[in-house]
Amino acid sequence: MVLNIRRIIYKYAKCLIITVLTIFFAQILISINYFPSIHENIFLRKNSHNSLHLNNLADVSARRINPGNSDDEDLAPRNHQNKAVLRKEELDFIPVCEVKSREAISAIHRAKSQFCKQLIVNKTCLIQNGNFYPQELNNDCKLNAKIFGRHIGCYLDEKKLRLLSSFYGNYANLNSPLYCLDICVQAGFPYAGVQYGTECFCGEESPPETSKIPDKSCDMKCPGDNNQVCGGYFTMNVYETGLHKFIPQTPETKNQDGKSIRIVFLLTLNGRALRQVYRLINTLYRKNHYFYIHIDKRQDYLHRELSSLEKQFPNIRLAPVRFSTIWGGASLLKMLLNCMKDFIDLGWEWDYVINLSESDFPIKSLEELENFLSANKGLNFVKSHGREVQRFIKKQGLDKTFLECETHMWRIGERKLPRGITIDGGSDWVALSPDFVSYIIEGKQDLLKGLEIIFEHTLLPAESFFHTVLRNSKFCNTYVDNNLHVTNWKRKLGCKCQYKHVVDWCGCSPNDFRTEDWAKIQNTLNRQLFFARKFEPIINQEIITRVEQFIGVNDHYLINNLEAYWQSIYDTNDLTASSDDTILTHAGSIIRQNSKILATEGCDIKLGEILEIHLYKYADVYKGNLILHKAVLNGLNVVIETWYKPKQHLELNFNSPIVDYIKTFRVGSDYDQKEMIFRNFGGILGPFSDPVLLYQFSSHKQSGNLTVLWLDPAGMLADVNIISRDENNLTNFVKPNIRHPLLPGLWKVGLFEQTTLVAVTKFLITPLEYFSGKEVSHQEVGLIHSGSQNSYRNLTNIKPLKFVPAKEESLLMEEVSNSNIKRIGNDLREWIDMLNIEFYSILGSCINDSKNTQESEKVLCGNYHFNPCTVTEWSSLSPDPKGSVGKLDIHTGRLKRV
């Protein structure tokens, strides 16, 4: 009996041991088969010796650097998805091939024009043929006798002290000596090593001879090539990549020979900040330097205003060929190269070209920059991301094909970068020598021809092109890892994927410097940094004034309106002026309101054409808008400027316990997530605007959820949003899901805590007097003023007290709204004026009378005295030396502002 029990116990124990061992070895096999790929190495490298410089990348690149899969492009392909199918019935052409790329098919469906759709199809088909991109390019940076692929031996490695410690990757199915060599060449390392079959290492230093062991100790087959061996257990086959150890040049700090230098300032301008452009030119101008100015093709106002500079100054030229330079677009690199070719053809003699935008400003005197560059003639200044090239390629999207059309960068598929060259990149702000620029512009080498094809289809191409050419050309020994710039990166604010509307990618943008960032600029005093970005006077002008003082500008005490800033919103000479229906409707109503106020003073004026509209700020506080328009006064043709400002419409329930936590609760449009402001300062909204609710809570508020209700002018709930209040979400925005056109009239937005109304704000959707530049007709009114109530969600069950009107009141509001939206002509204008009076206040008027020879003489109209605009401090026509191009001092070669 006892013997039988022992046999049974032995039998079950034996089975248990076999089961445990089977499970153990199965787990090992699973771990080997699913060993992390290159995309997972980011996390593995935390325990290995490497040179992951994410902070360096964060300092210079416009790409998101957050760890983890925070972007759609970070996610692995979902192979289980159904195959994408091209909807050929939407095309008016026959595709030349079967488009296989899911990304290309998505881009074709989203593109608006048939031209763009066909361009994407044709380019995708060329790439699918396999001969579009060069497979290999030559690296012309040969400074030693190293040979690509030469095996230098088998070496014993150590876990805590790796032979090659600069990069580590694990490639379970692909690894081979050639595969690892290509990766190390791409990253710019002199040595490549394979180990344990699947592992690839790169390094800068040759392994010590004391670690060399017999070749037979490296005996594991390579998964990517069974005819090759890939090291062994802590044994490594080491190969030369053919490259030398790359060491950027260290620039000199002092100019020994004292020779002068000539700089081409390549200004690439966008937007409407004309006065800031003048301020930048005033600071940099010397008669021995050159200014070559490219203005975005869409910026008619800026180009028109700056055209006169060519006649005033022989060393200033405007680019005759203009590009639409969207964020991240391939057109940016085309523009830079075209500009460089153009000023080379002009025959200018120069020593450096430095590209700047209207958002750049010098943080050292021009003389300091001249001395520094003079001491380092021939060197090329670019800023690199760091050494983790594989991550940079992935995060920058260099392994993707992009195509620009319809001012959009479409992602259309994957690609493999050519073998044989080192990939580098970082910032697109550079300082380049004439020899290097000429080498690029001539473009005779196969390297340049190949890179041209690659970067024509690359996101943010200027952030990598110049760096990559430098690293792989005869100019590799002129590379300086410094672009002379300090950039105000605030990743939590600047990396909000705010460019998704122009590019199929998540991008980052630096923040504007404000006075609270002053320490960052002060810290550059003893560093080789000469420019900072970004600066926007519409955001913060005080910091620019402080920087001018910092670099030695000493005329501020002579400028009366030093703290004032004006920026154009509208100009009648703009090519798009006639189609700005909302702004023209709004401005027309404001000047009619002003004429009625003047009429009460016995001043009758006949209104004429609206000429210009400016935004006005003083001491970095928005003070309103200024409308410049023609008028007939006392029988004379004059120009009047009217100053007005939006009213505040915030009602708070002081019985609510959380009301004290609310700092901001208002609606606007053109919300800038990075700067946390509405770019539409005046809150001018029409039926086709995209309203956004901005809210801000104090840091002492309680956590929890709040409800936001949107009520249209007819008393109907249009949308409901839930917002969270916590310490990490103090300032945020809500965009309602309401289709165009929005119903014109007075809208309300309510904030609720459960059923308690906490705050209410109002905003105006102005009816349109014009449509496509012409007065609206009966038929057009029915289209643009009818609203989109049929698309609202069913929210009839939500009826909070003191917000949604009762049934009878709601029916009356609906009846009034239906009557209003049918108005045209004078009846429509009366409705518009009635609404605008509730939302805007007139603050003053001034006059510009060409017949009046005395600038300080007032003009009497009835009982109203008009001051001349030229002596009215708030007027856009008042003198602004800091925002006007100065006069040339022939003795110093500088521009004097006053």
Q: Which residue ranges define each predicted feature?
A:
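Acidic donor-binding segment of Leloir-type glycosyltransferases
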Residues: 283, 288-320
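N-terminal signal-anchor transmembrane helix specifying type II single-pass membrane topology
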Residues: 2-59
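GT-A fold catalytic core of metal-dependent nucleotide-sugar glycosyltransferases
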Residues: 207-210, 341-391, 755
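Peripheral, non-catalytic regulatory segments
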Residues: 74-252
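C-terminal catalytic/acceptor-binding lobe
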Residues: 454-647, 880-896
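Contiguous segments within soluble domain cores/interaction surfaces
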Residues: 652-753, 757-762, 766-896
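Active-site-proximal specificity loops/subdomain of glycosyltransferases
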Residues: 310-351
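Catalytic core and acceptor-binding pocket of nucleotide-sugar-dependent glycosyltransferases
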Residues: 377, 385, 389-394, 399-520
